[in-house]
């Protein structure tokens, strides 16, 4: 059994123990890692993978098996919405933060005649360098997304502050997103999922109600230092 396989087994067991019977999705964050590494996780049963950069993402889509369920979790630029959203086995885009980007994604999915799951990214920490819409504007954006025929409002996503992720027993960012979900579900009348928690804090995120955790280094080890355009990718379907 490979190290990656062992890590996945351990993480899945920890998730199951923390989830108290809920289904929590494990998304393997694979940015900068070569396809050979992703295939180790795939062969261990992993199907949901998260990528951050368009060019790297599109290359990996070509090389990985077609039953992979891709999550785009990087900063979403308007100029790249169409290419990213045109991937047929894209499971979700988790970083919608403006109506314009949502409409561009909706248009691309209309061309495919395939609806797409989307998450609204929320800036829960208030940091200027973090993407996402402010909590006070989330309801308006959710309503706009609901009106788009080829988008399925899946839930809310956040990338919390580094300092909060290092806390062992509480996390203000997770609390903000959890409270926001409750109020939005009452307002919109639909269930919403939470995508929050990474390698350093995914178990705590689950305690706050996360339905999807994005784990990278705990599965694959330290991330390579190359920029996405320099990553060597060599594998075949």
UniProtKB/Swiss-Prot annotation:
Q: Is Cytoplasm set as a keyword in this record?
A: yes
**A single MF term (Gene Ontology):** pyridoxal phosphate binding
Q: Which UniProt keywords apply?
A: Cytoplasm, Nucleus, Pyridoxal phosphate
Report one GO cellular component.
Answer: nucleus
User: What Pfam families does the record point to?
Assistant: Ala_racemase_N
What residues bear N6-(pyridoxal phosphate)lysine in this entry? 31
User: Which Gene3D superfamilies does UniProt cross-reference here?
Assistant: Alanine racemase (3.20.20.10)
**Which terms does the UniProt entry file under GO BP?**
vitamin B6 metabolic process
Q: Where in the cell is it found?
A: Cytoplasm; Nucleus
Q: Which family does it belong to?
A: Belongs to the pyridoxal phosphate-binding protein YggS/PROSC family.
Q: What does this protein do?
A: Pyridoxal 5'-phosphate (PLP)-binding protein, which may be involved in intracellular homeostatic regulation of pyridoxal 5'-phosphate (PLP), the active form of vitamin B6.
Can you name this protein?
A: Pyridoxal phosphate homeostasis protein
């Amino acid at each position: 059994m490979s190290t990656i396989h062992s890590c996945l087994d351990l993480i899945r067991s920890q998730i199951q123990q923390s989830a108290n019977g809920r289904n929590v999705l494990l998304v393997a964050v694979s940015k900068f890692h070569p396809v050979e590494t992703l295939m180790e996780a795939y062969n261990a049963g992993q199907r949901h993978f998260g990528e951050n950069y368009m060019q790297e993402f599109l290359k990996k889509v070509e090389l990985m098996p077609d039953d992979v369920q891709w999550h785009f979790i990087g900063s979403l630029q308007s100029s790249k919405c169409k290419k990213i959203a045109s991937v047929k086995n894209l499971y979700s885009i988790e970083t919608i933060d403006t109506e314009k980007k949502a409409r561009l994604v909706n248009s691309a999915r209309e061309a495919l005649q395939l609806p797409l799951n989307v998450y609204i990214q929320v800036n829960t920490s208030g940091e200027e360098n973090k993407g996402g819409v402010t909590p006070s504007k989330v309801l308006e954006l959710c309503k706009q997304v609901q009106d788009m025929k080829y988008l399925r409002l899946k839930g809310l996503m956040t990338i919390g502050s580094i300092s909060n992720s290092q806390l062992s027993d509480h996390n203000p960012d997770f609390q903000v997103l959890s409270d926001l979900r409750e109020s939005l579900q009452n307002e919109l009348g639909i269930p919403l999922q939470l995508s929050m928690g990474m390698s350093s804090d995914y178990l705590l995120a689950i305690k706050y109600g996360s339905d999807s955790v994005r784990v990278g280094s705990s599965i694959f080890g330290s991330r390579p230092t190359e920029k996405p355009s320099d990553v060597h990718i060599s594998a075949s379907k």
